[in-house]
């Protein structure tokens, strides 16, 4: 029993940190006068995949979560200007575990954002 709990805890922590990494990879908030700029749609990756949002309590609507932290998750909606992950969470988790693939895909997305 104890080994299962330890293993389950380890897997849960890894998944939590992977999702956090995926949602914020490569995105920066400017810091002027010692204060970070206000959070915008360009500071987290969103996902419009309905099945993923249903199964993760709207986890993919990450930008609005940061902009309206007290808003209940069923009321979160997709922001039109929000930047999109190139795939759903399942694919993104696998990609994050394969660094060469992750950097190949995501660094191009970030480079494209810098031209906007």
Give, region by region, the residue ranges found by the protein language model.
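Cytosolic/stromal cytosol-facing helical appendages immediately following the last transmembrane segment
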Residues: 5, 11-116
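Transmembrane helix interruption/hinge and helix-loop junction motifs
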Residues: 1-3
């Amino acid at each position: 029993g104890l080994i299962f709990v330890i293993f389950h805890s380890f897997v849960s922590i890894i998944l939590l940190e992977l999702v956090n990494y995926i949602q914020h990879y490569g995105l920066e908030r400017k810091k002027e006068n010692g204060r970070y700029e206000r959070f915008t749609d360009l500071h987290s990756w969103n996902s419009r995949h309905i099945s993923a949002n249903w199964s993760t309590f709207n986890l993919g609507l990450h930008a609005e979560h940061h902009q309206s932290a007290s808003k209940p998750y069923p009321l979160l909606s997709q922001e039109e200007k929000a930047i999109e992950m190139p795939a759903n969470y399942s694919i993104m988790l696998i990609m994050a575990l394969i660094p060469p693939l992750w950097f190949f895909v995501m660094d191009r997305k970030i480079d494209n954002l810098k031209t906007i």
